[in-house]
Amino acid sequence: KILDLLSYTDFYRRDHQLIFKAISELSEKSRPYDAVTLGDWFESHALADQVGGTPYLVELAQTTPSAANIRAYAEIVRDKSVLRSLIEVGTQIAEDGVAPGNRETPDLLAEAEQRVFKIADQNRSGRKDMVSLKEAMKEAFELLQVRYETQGTVTGLPTGFTDFDEMTAGLQPSDLIVLAARPAMGKTTLALNMAEYAALKSKKAVVVFSMEMSASQLAFRLISSIGRINAGRLKTGQLEDEDWSRVTMAMKMLSESKIFIDDEPALSPAKLLSKARRIKREHDLGLVVVDYLQLMQVPGNSENRATEISEISRSLKAMAKELSVPVIALSQLNRGLESRTDKRPVMSDLRESGAIEQDADIILFIYRDEYYHKDSTDKGLAEVIISKHRNGATGTVKLKFFGEYTRFDNLARDAVGSFE
């Protein structure tokens, strides 16, 4: 338990750091640790002179109070370590304020916040910047055990789309999921459907950064989707009697969820990250949605759009990793696909595709044949094309599309598994 709370770096003195490392190693090997065994360990590692040899170890053992209060002592060490980190970070922030160099003020604020947030996050989790392979293997094995015990189920955040969740095992922490489509294909709708299900099912917080639509517009979409209410009637207010009970039900469900909407336009990566960190600190953040990537801006970098998109893409992946949550980033597609016979999107259709393709863990495209062919036999159907999946399979998932409800739904299957 103490090993979960402390690391050797939490000790100020070098000799105490070494003693804690030695105790940790002996403990992991289920070997006893006292002045004699520790002295032998330091002798075998040629480190005895750095800790004062056996005499100092004996002195420590004799002057140490009872082990009954060991956790309280460990918490004191941890608290002092946090205070030293704050002093160090505070000094760095002050130095940056005096000599900012070429960095803009928003960037300095973001860096300062990140440094303080890292200390707070490490204080909660006890996690350090660097872990040994042994520690990483232990975490991997524990995760494998969980996956083994939940075989056939979703290990990440569920989206509510059965076939998609089966292929991806849900939205995984630290993954950047890029969802791209031509206008009117339903990319905002699909992202909101995933967000609403994740929030209602997992009870985690979901934050949607909407740089295209207002918060009230998204709220109406969510009400339409949850309540199965015609979006057109919601827009005009011409509701039927049965619609009101559905509106009430949908609003009750949504008001009890932890969905947050930020509709500030043209967010910078630094500002978006700052807002997401705040939600992470105050709530159990489970998912971030960005609508959409090309509407973000990087201050002072407007001359080269490709470079700007590259920086935005990298920042979103870094955010997913830092916050340990999946990030769904919506993206535009080039108009070029409209001139092709087969208008199903491919990787090269991503606008400023190079960096996005590289940074994304999953790339999804939406294709609805009825949009291009009015006599299509696939009316009401949508293809969600998993074009890239860094840690799993690619393929196509078919969903029902209900435009009037701003909603996608699972396709029903018959007894032999084919789609009805």
Predicted stretch roles:
Residues 166, 189, 197-284, 298, ...:
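Cytosolic-facing regulatory segments adjacent to core modules
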Residues 1-82:
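Noncatalytic partner-interaction/assembly domains of nucleic-acid and motor enzyme complexes
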Residues 118-175:
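Pre-Walker A segment
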Residues 273-285, 314-324, 335-420:
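C-terminal regions of RecA-like/P-loop NTPase motor modules
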Residues 183:
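The conserved Walker
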Residues 285-330:
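Helical hairpin unit composed of two closely spaced alpha helices linked by a short loop
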Residues 186:
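Conserved glycine(s) of the Walker
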Residues 54-114, 118-125:
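Extended, charged alpha-helical coiled-coil/arm scaffolds that mediate oligomerization and mechanical coupling
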